[in-house]
Amino acid sequence: MRLTLPDFFAELDGFTERIPLDFLTHRLTKLEVSLDEFRQYLQFGANTYRRNLIHEGLCYQALVLCWRSGQRSPIHDHRGSTCGVRVLSGVAIETLFDQTEGGWIYATGSHALGENQVCGSQDSDIHQVSNLRPRGENLVSLHIYSPALLVMGTYSLTDVTRGEFTDPIYAFADGAGI
C-alpha cells in the first residue's frame, strides 16, 4: 500500500508519546514522496543550513532541512529525542562519533546517504550531517524529531566540554506550514 505524506503524518499523529526509532526509520523508507511536494518549504540559509518546519504533532516535529554545498550541522547528540532522516535530494554525509571515558570524541566512520535513503539516531548518539558536494549541488532532507529537538548537546574535537546549541526553526505564514 502506498504511504503518502498525509498518511504518514496521520500515522505519527496517532502517537501520544515518543515514536520508536525502528518504526520511524521503517516508515520513512516506505514513504512515497517527491521533492515537488516540499517546494514551498525549500528555503536555504546563506551561511548555515536551514531548518524549515512543515508539520507538528503532539509528540513530533517534521522539518525540511536545506543545505548548500559546504554546510554542516554541529557535531551533536539528540538528547531525549528520536530522529529519522530521509534524503529528498542530493547526498548527505553522516559522520558518527564515539566518546572516550575522558570525554573526548572521535569519528568512528562516515557514510553517504543518497536520494531516498534513510538514517536514524537518538539520545546520546553523536553525529554530524554535512553537504560536501561541489558548489551548486544542494541537499534537501526530511527530519522527524520525536519529541521535538529544541536543544542539542554539542561536541568539539578539541575540547571535552559539552555545549548546548539551540538551532532555529523557521515556520511559514500565509497558509503554508502549520
Regions found by a protein language model. Give the residues of each.
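A short glycine-rich, His/Asp/Glu-containing loop-to-beta-strand
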Residues: 40-71
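Conserved short histidine dyad/triad with adjacent acidic residue
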Residues: 63-78, 122-124
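Short beta-strand His + acidic residue motifs that chelate non-heme Fe in jelly-roll/DSBH
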Residues: 74-76, 94-95, 121, 127-134
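N-terminal leader/capping segments at the start of a protein or of a new domain
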Residues: 1-36
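A short hydrophobic beta-strand segment most commonly corresponding to one strand
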Residues: 84, 135-151
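Short acidic-glycine-tyrosine-enriched beta hairpin
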Residues: 84, 99-127, 166-170
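Long hydrophobic alpha-helical segments typical of transmembrane helices together
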Residues: 161-178
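Glycine- and acidic-residue-biased ligand/ion/polar-headgroup-sensing regions
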Residues: 69, 80-100
